[in-house]
């Protein structure tokens, strides 16, 4: 009995010693796989399989010029004695619309369509001859300010700049939302995943900003009305 117990204890000691002297293994997480160039290419090809139309290309190309004018208007705010609230709004517009221009330019380039520069000018459809069915006449995008309106805004300072900026940007944003409505009202257009999300975001964001600017304009006009002469 005692010899049997001693045998069991001896075996247990040997096992413990083996565990204590064994090399310590540290669990390591497997490194994340790096996508191969071919996998990236396949993913990009998959993203291009969504159908797109002439109306989609026109929308993205036209919105680049449309956004560009809003950026020019917003960049005048710091140099034209704008109200702090207008300065904050202008900064948000610049940041958001510069990013969106990049998205639109990449979308067009990925589909081998002409990529307009970010210039606030009348949208010249003649620069979009790469896709059949384009109307080649120069045209003004909805809501864009005329040369006379832009000159008046650039000449204004202080409260006059605030008023012209807000009224002009409300007009500008309403034009952008009308472009979205036209896109979604065109048969077959707006089905591409990127365009659908982008256009939907433009509609929501700019509709929200229109309401904000209308409140700001009302508050500025009220403040001016009660201010002593």
Q: At which residue positions do the language-model features occur?
A:
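Bacterial N-terminal signal peptides that target proteins for export
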Residues: 2-12
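Bacterial N-terminal signal peptides
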Residues: 10-21
